[in-house]
Amino acid sequence: MLVIPAIDLQSGRCVRLKQGRFDQVTQFSVFPIERALHFAKLGAKRLHVVDLDGARSGKMQQLELICSMQKTGIPIQAGGGIRSIEQALECSNAGISQLVIGSLAITNPDLTIQIIEKIKPENIVLALDVRVDTKVPLLAINGWQNNSTSSLWEVVSYYENYGIKNILCTDIACDGMMNGPNFDLYQQAVEYFPQIAWQASGGVRHMQDITTLNSLGISAVILGLMLYQDNVNFEELLC
């Protein structure tokens, strides 16, 4: 299983949100390029970078910074505001390894399919963020500011027909809380769609959580707030 450090960007700085709330932001003193270089030196195989300003505004705002981060030698999957073919091509042509498409996949499937066809499915990660208030996980959009009526399973089934294999799934209630992932959700995901390379995000606290996700068949785990804790040895997590 791939262990992927996450870096959230806001106004050029590293931040973390609690449960996706923009009014609950923690800003860190380390600069994004330094953080990327740190993970590259430790042996990370990929970075997950989110432009929070882009996610909120609908257009990626920090592409130049993200490209500078990738120059540290670590491939990046990046998202936050990729909501047009032009923006997707700009990111791809700038050298971003994989584009993370979120809200657009729910609000504009036709445009999303055009992007998939242009960029190729293997270069796309669909980021599907859910609220599990009922038995059915429903998707949130626009930086988690709004809820949709689409279920996770409906959307995955739809895009599977267009060659999508990489899906990043976050239970919003777990994100930034350090209370553990939603294991039941990921177990269901793998059971329903075993051919999808699932990336789990939200709530991971320690090595045991990672081990459990691996045992469920999850392909990758995204680590955010956990990596800002003083007692975490990232090199050990890679083993």
Curated annotation (Swiss-Prot):
Entry keyword Cytoplasm: yes
Main location per the UniProt record: cytoplasm
Annotated catalytic residues: 8 (proton acceptor), 129 (proton donor)
Coiled coil start-end: none
Isomerase is among the record's keywords: yes
Chemical reaction(s) catalysed: 1-(5-phospho-beta-D-ribosyl)-5-[(5-phospho-beta-D-ribosylamino)methylideneamino]imidazole-4-carboxamide = 5-[(5-phospho-1-deoxy-D-ribulos-1-ylimino)methylamino]-1-(5-phospho-beta-D-ribosyl)imidazole-4-carboxamide
Catalytic activity, EC: 5.3.1.16
Keywords recorded for this protein, A-Z: Amino-acid biosynthesis, Cytoplasm, Histidine biosynthesis, Isomerase
Pathway: Amino-acid biosynthesis; L-histidine biosynthesis; L-histidine from 5-phospho-alpha-D-ribose 1-diphosphate: step 4/9
Subcellular location: Cytoplasm
Pfam families for the chain: His_biosynth
Gene Ontology MF terms in the entry: 1-(5-phosphoribosyl)-5-[(5-phosphoribosylamino)methylideneamino]imidazole-4-carboxamide isomerase activity
Broad class of enzyme this protein falls into: isomerase
One biological process term in Gene Ontology: L-tryptophan biosynthetic process
Domain of life according to the entry: Bacteria
Alphabetical list of InterPro entries matching this protein: Aldolase_TIM, His_biosynth, HisA_bact_arch, Isoase_HisA-like, Isoase_HisA-like_bact, RibuloseP-bd_barrel
GO CC, alphabetical: cytoplasm
UniProt similarity note: Belongs to the HisA/HisF family.
PANTHER family given in the database record: 1-(5-PHOSPHORIBOSYL)-5-[(5-PHOSPHORIBOSYLAMINO)METHYLIDENEAMINO] IMIDAZOLE-4-CARBOXAMIDE ISOMERASE
Stated name of the protein: 1-(5-phosphoribosyl)-5-[(5-phosphoribosylamino)methylideneamino] imidazole-4-carboxamide isomerase
Protein's organism: Legionella pneumophila (strain Paris)
